[in-house]
A protein has these predicted regions:
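N-terminal TM1-TM2 helical hairpin plus the immediately adjacent luminal interfacial "cap"
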Residues: 15-91, 95-98, 102-110, 165-173
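Alpha-helical transmembrane segments that form the membrane-embedded catalytic/substrate-binding core
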Residues: 63-70, 111-122, 168-190
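Internal alpha-helical transmembrane segments of multi-pass membrane proteins
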Residues: 84-85, 112, 132-144
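Mid-bilayer segments of alpha-helical transmembrane spans in multi-pass integral membrane proteins
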Residues: 98-99, 103, 124, 147-152
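Terminal transmembrane helical module of multi-pass membrane proteins
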Residues: 141-192
Length: 202
């Protein structure tokens, strides 16, 4: 068997994170949300909540929308060429997204994949923007510009929660902002979009 056939696809790590996000959200339906959700007063004594908060969902619609978003993000990462560096950046952004919610102490509880998904979009958008000149960069720039516009329209500085027509829960704009920022910063730190130094690189 040739070396080419043995070579692991670079997107596998991205797919694995997507599966972990979706699988955890499904499994968490059988658990007590109070044991998993983000609560600022428990950040130091129960640090696992900066991971498990992503798996808590407040309604069936909330869960279904985020599972669909996770599937779309997995596909986006594949098209964008998100390899090991991008997956590492997204993984690092996971806990940072929720820890950053301490910046809005009025948000007394949070659960959901949306912050993590915003982080993934920021990473994938940066991957595209830092790629080869041409259409991919245009798509990356448009994706990131749309993300920034969305965050501005949500105005996270106006309060911890926002009621949106069509949703049966209130959204937390700060989670979207913290996720997007964490994803972008982690992408910078991890060198997302830079050429690998060798064939075994990320």
């Amino acid at each position: 068997m040739s070396v080419a056939r043995l070579r692991v696809r670079p997107e596998l790590a991205w797919w694995g994170l997507s599966a972990l996000a979706a699988g955890g959200a499904l499994a968490a339906q059988a658990l007590d949300p109070a044991a998993l959700r983000w609560q600022p007063e428990l950040a130091l004594t129960e640090p696992w909540r900066c991971i498990s908060a992503a798996w808590v969902h407040w309604s069936g619609l909330h869960l279904a929308a985020n599972l669909a978003g996770t599937a779309l993000l997995a596909a986006l990462g594949t098209v964008a060429g998100c390899g090991q560096r991008a997956a590492l950046a997204w993984a690092l952004a996971w806990p940072i997204t929720h820890v950053a919610l301490l910046l809005q102490p009025a948000l007394m509880a949070y659960g959901g994949l949306s912050g993590l998904l915003h982080a993934g979009v920021a990473v994938a958008g940066w991957q595209l923007l830092r790629g080869e000149l041409g259409q991919r960069q245009v798509i990356g720039a448009a994706l990131l510009a749309g993300l920034v516009l969305k965050l501005l329209l949500e105005a996270p500085w106006q309060g911890p929660l926002r009621t949106v027509a069509g949703w049966d829960i209130a959204i937390a704009p700060m989670a979207h902002a913290s996720g997007s920022t964490a994803g972008w910063l982690c992408a910078l730190v991890c060198g997302v979009g830079k050429p690998a130094r060798n064939a075994a690189g990320g």
